[in-house]
Amino acid sequence: MAPETKNDFLEIADSDADSDIGYNSEEDDMQKGGRGAKRRKVESDDEDDPGSDIGSDDEDEATEKDSKKTQEEDKKEDQPEKPKRKSKDTTSTELPDVTRTLTKKNLVASEAAIKKSGVVYLSRIPPFMKPAKLRSLLEPYGTINRIFLAPEDPASHARRVRAGGNKKRSYTEGWVEFTKKKDAKAVCDLLNARTIGGKKGSYYHDDLWNLLYLKGFKWHNLTEQIAAENAERSSRMRAEISKSTKENKEFVRNVEKAKMLDGMAVKAKAKKRKAETHTEGQEDESVRQVKRSFKQVPLAKKKMDGEDQPAEVTRVLSKIF
């Protein structure tokens, strides 16, 4: 029998050394962040079965995702958290909400934003345009905070409806508040005296914009102006009401006075008539009491037959007869 060239004990030692090193390519690749090589069994049964390969691929992908997640979490833990900076600009540039009541703190914070805001005046509102439609048309040119549109006279609306016209509400003029002055100025420069545009078949396509930037004018000035107009209107109404009540009282007083004077006149006439009838009765009594005496003319004496006529009478009578 020939002697063996290889030493079995040396081969066993080498294998033990390799096991002590413990190199694992998959673990190394995971630590480096790379993708581990897929393991495939050399056995004929595993090669013939395709389901085993799919299952091994799924397991490898799941382990790879878990490793990536753990690495990302480790990186986040290693990085120190940065303190959040309080942004002063956001609190100062934002205008206060219209629906909320302004507290003292919010009022102080909104003063800077109010100074930066700008107001645009619309001298004419297209017929039957609502505030929501106006906001949608002007919103692309800048951030809008508040809109106020003055409604038409109720009497004119009632006349239009009675005549068979449109029943929708219309507005005569309006004010739009932008959060930035430059946006308000740019809107006026860009859109003033130009058509509203949009789709050709839209209702407001051919209407013109009438925009004017109010320099130095703020929203509180508008509210003060509206409050002053309302106060003036109410004071004028109170003055008219007091005047009408005064006239009504004067009219009632004059009517009562006229009735009183008429009653006094009727009483005076009745008294006078009564006095006249009383005096007439007294005169009748006095006439009845006094005897009337009339001076009578003496009667002519009848001529006697024996008396002679004068000579002249006889002579005239003789000439006649």
UniProtKB/Swiss-Prot annotation:
Keyword RNA-binding listed: yes
Biased amino acid composition, Basic and acidic residues: 64-82, 276-288
Keywords: Nucleus, Ribosome biogenesis, RNA-binding, rRNA processing
Protein's cellular compartments: Nucleus, Nucleolus
GO cellular component: nucleolus
GO molecular function list: RNA binding
Predominant cellular place of this UniProt entry's protein: nucleus
GO biological process: endonucleolytic cleavage in 5'-ETS of tricistronic rRNA transcript (SSU-rRNA, 5.8S rRNA, LSU-rRNA); endonucleolytic cleavage in ITS1 to separate SSU-rRNA from 5.8S rRNA and LSU-rRNA from tricistronic rRNA transcript (SSU-rRNA, 5.8S rRNA, LSU-rRNA); endonucleolytic cleavage to generate mature 5'-end of SSU-rRNA from (SSU-rRNA, 5.8S rRNA, LSU-rRNA); small-subunit processome assembly
Region of interest (Disordered), ranges: 1-98, 266-291
Biased composition annotated in UniProt, kind: Acidic residues: 11-29, 44-63
Family, per entry: Belongs to the ESF2/ABP1 family.
Function recorded in the entry: Involved in the small subunit (SSU) processome assembly and function, and in the 18S rRNA synthesis. Required for the early cleavages at sites A0, A1 and A2.
This protein's name: Pre-rRNA-processing protein ESF2
Lineage per the UniProt record: Eukaryota, Fungi, Dikarya, Ascomycota, Pezizomycotina
